[in-house]
């Protein structure tokens, strides 16, 4: 029996018209995407801060470096030419680099460094990114001065999910060492086993600000008009400290973090960790005057040294006639006020309900620790008890190989890494107690994930050796922060409190020193991806590990081939 479906010609023509217009719209969207070409020349340049001139690494002689701007859907091609005396790589922090780990940047993980006199072309395809992200060096300590903002506007024809601001202002929070050669800091610390040299100031857009010597005239100024709204794109590029941030007499509205929109909330201050970015609306609703924009450290570590200074910029109202009077300072929580930090971060919620992985087939628990190691010779080190500092994830202190892991994985080079990174702490113990019951081991170990695995990763902070919040960053992915708490993670009770409806989507999350954070993601981006603490001394000491995500079954789910100009090892 033959069945015929009789559809009126008018409906067929209507459907054909709809399909045609959808095709035209798709073609238009593809055509309007742009390719942006940039040249980044790495070179040393002398800068004067704090009454002293020091040579630093820069991109194109700028500190901070150039701001990259593009629209969602665009592509960037960045030719990096190394004219400096140090090896260099660059990382595009917050860009997923889908199927293209060759352009992700961490040295000896996805590439060998660009040597002096050589070059390498990075390719960034902004398929899903939107908002404020950033770029920075990912070799040695070069990111202290080699960094910049990366602004990804909504797709052309789209708009922000908040009132359009009158103006947008990137604010990069950084650090400055008065006399130290930044590139030599980790080597000096490694020789002694102690902590790296502490910075002499924090900076806002490269300037220490009003409260430091020889700095007042160059203090960064933000000019505003009363009644208008401004979008502040704030990036914490500081090497080693979380920061409290505030503007005197002004309430801030937080609208996004790490390039993902949030349910808007108001706060008199921010707490932002190294590696994080935040989009904040400022309503210039105060009487014309000039007000301090200020940031200083939040440090929950007991007994650890840190820069205790305060950096400032000035919010200047147009028409202010009181500019000879010292600006008003904002209230910032005390440096060790953990409840202030927790109160702020607990307000993060995705703007809308999100598709959180529910059926988990890969469960990982990573204990992250600062450790002490015995010195290798007869001389005592300068760490506590004459030992040297180290750090670890699941008791493994990561060691950079001599050939990058991605190349070794792709080309089947043996002896570079091992696939036996522990998926849980090798020995269970009281993670938030006062000591570690076993010594740390060194290794270059990875976890291999099947393509499309649904992963739950518990990041368990520890209390030992003056640890503070660990800002953990995962390359190649964003994840949902479904839960967080203090104490040891309880697998029976704590998941009952997860937020599986509208958890924030992030790329860098702060893990409490004596608590835990739970994140979930789908391993659908094949490649080799670094997971590490964004406190630079912790990463230098070994608080890193690597995920290898296998290729999927189709061409569109497999890694792209390596580029011809990949730096040699």
UniProtKB/Swiss-Prot annotation:
SUPFAM superfamilies per UniProt: Cupredoxins (SSF49503)
Gene3D superfamilies: Cupredoxins - blue copper proteins (2.60.40.420)
An individual GO BP term: lignin catabolic process
Record text on cofactor binding: Binds 4 Cu cations per monomer.
Residues that, per the record, bind Cu cation 3: 138, 475, 532
Cofactor: Cu cation
UniProt-annotated binding residues for Cu cation 2: 93, 136, 534
Domain spans labelled Plastocyanin-like: 41-157, 167-320, 420-553
Disulphide connectivity of cysteines: none
Residues bound to Cu cation 1: 91, 473
Signal peptide span: 1-33
Glycosylated position list: 87, 190, 249, 336, 374, 395, 430, 452
EC number, UniProt record: 1.10.3.2
InterPro entries in the cross-refs: Cu-oxidase-like_N (IPR011707), Cu-oxidase_2nd (IPR001117), Cu-oxidase_C (IPR011706), Cu-oxidase_fam (IPR045087), Cu_oxidase_CS (IPR033138), Cu_oxidase_Cu_BS (IPR002355), Cupredoxin (IPR008972), CuRO_1_LCC (IPR034288)
Expression tissues: Expressed at low levels in flowers and siliques.
Coiled-coil region: none
GO MF terms, alphabetically ordered: copper ion binding; hydroquinone:oxygen oxidoreductase activity
Ligand binding (Cu cation 4): 470, 533, 538, 543
An annotated GO cellular component: apoplast
Family: Belongs to the multicopper oxidase family.
Known role: Lignin degradation and detoxification of lignin-derived products.
Listed name of the protein: Laccase-14
UniProt organism field: Arabidopsis thaliana
């Amino acid at each position: 029996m033959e069945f015929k479906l009789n559809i009126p010609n008018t409906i067929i023509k209507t459907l054909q018209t709809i399909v045609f217009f959808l095709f035209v719209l798709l073609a238009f969207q593809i055509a309007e995407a742009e390719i942006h070409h940039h040249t980044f020349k790495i070179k040393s340049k002398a800068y004067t801060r704090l009454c002293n001139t020091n040579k630093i690494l820069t991109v194109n002689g700028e500190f901070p470096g150039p701001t990259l701007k593009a629209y969602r859907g665009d592509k960037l091609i960045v030719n990096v030419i190394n004219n400096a005396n140090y090896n260099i790589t660059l990382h595009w922090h917050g860009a997923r680099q889908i199927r293209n780990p060759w352009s992700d940047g961490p040295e000896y993980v996805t590439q060998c460094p660009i040597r002096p006199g050589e070059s390498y072309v990075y390719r960034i395809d902004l398929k899903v990114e939107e908002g404020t992200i950033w770029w920075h060096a990912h070799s040695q300590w070069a990111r202290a001065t080699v960094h910049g903002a990366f602004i990804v506007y909504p797709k052309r024809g789209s708009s922000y999910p908040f009132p359009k601001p009158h103006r947008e202002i990137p604010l990069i929070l950084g650090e400055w060492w008065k006399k130290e050669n930044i590139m030599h800091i980790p080597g000096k610390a490694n020789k002694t086993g102690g902590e790296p040299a502490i910075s002499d100031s924090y900076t806002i857009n490269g300037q220490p600000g009003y409260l430091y010597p020889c700095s007042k005239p160059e203090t960064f100024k933000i000019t505003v008009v009363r009644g208008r709204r401004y979008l502040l794109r704030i990036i914490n590029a500081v090497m080693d400290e979380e920061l409290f941030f505030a503007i005197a007499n002004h309430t801030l509205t937080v609208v996004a973090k790490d390039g993902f929109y949030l349910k808007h909330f108001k706060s008199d201050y921010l707490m932002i960790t190294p590696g994080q970015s935040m989009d904040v609306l400022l309503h210039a609703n105060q009487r014309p005057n000039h007000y301090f924009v200020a940031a200083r450290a939040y440090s929950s570590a007991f007994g650890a040294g840190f820069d205790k200074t305060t950096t400032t910029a000035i919010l200047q109202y147009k028409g202010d006639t009181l500019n000879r009077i010292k600006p008003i300072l904002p209230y910032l929580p005390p440096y060790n006020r953990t409840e202030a930090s927790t109160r702020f971060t607990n307000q993060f919620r995705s703007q809308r309900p999100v598709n959180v992985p529910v059926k988990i087939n890969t469960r990982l628990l990573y204990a992250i620790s600062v450790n002490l190691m015995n010195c290798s010779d007869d001389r005592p080190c300068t760490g506590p008890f004459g030992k040297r500092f180290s750090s670890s994830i699941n008791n493994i202190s990561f060691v950079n190989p001599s050939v990058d892991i991605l190349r070794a994985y792709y080309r089947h080079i043996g002896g570079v890494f091992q696939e036996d990174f522990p998926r849980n702490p090798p020995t269970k113990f009281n993670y938030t107690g006062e000591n570690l019951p076993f010594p740390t081991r060194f290794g270059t170990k990875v976890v291999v994930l099947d393509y499309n695995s649904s992963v739950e990763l518990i990041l368990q902070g520890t209390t030992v050796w003056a640890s503070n919040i660990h800002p953990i960053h995962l390359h190649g992915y964003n994840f949902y922060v479904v839960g967080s708490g203090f104490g040891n993670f309880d697998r029976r009770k704590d998941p009952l409190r997860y937020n599986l409806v509208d958890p924030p989507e992030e790329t860098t999350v702060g893990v409490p020193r004596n608590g835990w954070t739970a994140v979930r993601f789908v391993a659908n981006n094949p490649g080799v991806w670094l997971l590490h603490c964004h406190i630079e001394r912790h990463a230098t000491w070994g608080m890193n590990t690597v995920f290898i995500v296998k290729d999927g079954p189709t061409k569109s789910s497999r890694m792209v081939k390596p580029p011809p100009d990949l730096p040699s090892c």
